[in-house]
Amino acid sequence: NVNIGVWTKLFKAKTIKGIEYDKAIRINEDKLFIFEALMKAEKYVVYDVSKYNYIQREVSATRKFDDRWFDTLDVADYMLELIKKEKPELLRWAEINQIKVYYWLLLMLFRNHDAVEMYSKQYNRVVCLLKKAKLLKISKYISRNMFLQILLIKVSEPLFKRIKGRG
């Protein structure tokens, strides 16, 4: 499990040469940058020690929900496609990442008043992917709560919405 903050990393110049931030991605651009760097890296080392204090403000851009958050779906989809082409042996992990990202965004939609209605097209995209998820294949890699909620979406999306207070 690698933290996605670029500010927690040191890279050799040759590893990140040619990798640029995608200016079209408004949130999760650092996750994509790290992913591309790891795809190029010959090896990496995780040194689990805190040497940096990080403060998150309540008014931070990453606290407020808006359409930028849907960029996380595009990043997860891109990562999956790149893994399929370049490192198929990691496909299961890319699929799990994609499902977790979509699930997390679904929860964000329900936590923000009127977001499900306001972003109905994106909501449908999220639900469609989660309904197709092969839960038994990934059940040991996700939490029991996530498993049960995705299962409920597969069985009865209206019941899921009612339980979440939006149906």
Feature roles, as predicted:
Residues 1-44, 55-65, 69:
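Donor-binding/catalytic cores of nucleotide-activated saccharide
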Residues 42, 49-50:
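Extended, low-polarity segments enriched in aliphatic/aromatic residues
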Residues 43-44, 89, 136:
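A general structural signal for well-ordered secondary-structure junctions
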Residues 50-58, 63-89, 104, 108, ...:
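Catalytic core of nucleotide-sugar-dependent glycosyltransferases
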Residues 89-97:
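All-alpha amphipathic helical-bundle segments outside canonical DNA-binding/catalytic cores
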Residues 99-102:
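GST superfamily/GST-like fold recognition
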Residues 111-167:
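Membrane-interface aromatic/basic loop that binds lipid-linked glycans or pyrophosphate carriers
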